[in-house]
């Protein structure tokens, strides 16, 4: 329901500007493409915050979504230890991130994506592993070291509900 009714979507709308750079829709604020097909590309934290806040407000929840991009893995583990799951930007199967492609937004920010970019929820950890709730694979356990490497490669992007 959250994706179908609350997630802001847009096409990439790519074009070359007079400066010769490729421009397109801000994927931080919109899911690019259709989230229900393989043609859907990706979205950033802004789109998830918008969707979550809309859903939470409509269900009467006092919770709100917050973009905490830039948080260290230790900060994520602290939140999980306190019972707060964290939406994290990672890759499918926690594989190394593939080569990225991207474009500039109208405000000049560069946004990129890779064919194995993915979002999931960090729900647990040990000294050597992390537990992820993955919308594709279900509950998965990965090497903590690999998670931290992949999380960093995705710009330490993350969202929490408070």
Regions found by a protein language model. Give the residues of each.
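Short regulatory "switch" loops immediately downstream of catalytic or recognition motifs
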Residues: 56-57, 91-103
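Cysteine-nucleophile protease catalytic domains, especially the papain-like/related folds used
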Residues: 1-85, 159-162
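Noncatalytic regulatory segments and standalone regulatory/sensor domains
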Residues: 100-114, 123-162
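Structural motif
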Residues: 87-89
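Solvent-exposed loop/turn segments at secondary-structure junctions
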Residues: 7-8, 20-22, 70-73, 92-96, ...
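Envelope-exposed proteins and targeting segments
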Residues: 84, 116-118, 128
């Amino acid at each position: 329901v959250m994706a179908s009714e609350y997630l802001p979507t847009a096409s990439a709308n790519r074009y070359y500007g007079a400066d010769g750079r490729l421009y397109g829709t801000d994927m931080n604020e919109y899911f690019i493409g259709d989230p229900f097909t393989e043609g859907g590309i990706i979205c950033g934290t802004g789109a998830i915050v918008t969707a979550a806040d809309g859903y939470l407000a409509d269900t009467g929840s006092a919770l709100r979504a917050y973009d905490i991009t830039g948080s260290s893995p230790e900060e994520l583990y602290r939140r999980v230890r306190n019972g707060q799951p964290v939406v994290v930007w990672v890759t499918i199967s926690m594989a190394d991130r593939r080569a990225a492609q991207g474009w500039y937004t109208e405000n000049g920010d560069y946004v990129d994506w890779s064919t194995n970019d993915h979002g999931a929820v960090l729900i647990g950890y040990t000294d050597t592993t992390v537990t992820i709730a993955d919308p594709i694979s279900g509950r998965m356990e990965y090497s903590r070291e690999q998670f931290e490497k992949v999380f960093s490669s995705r710009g330490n992007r993350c969202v929490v509900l408070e």
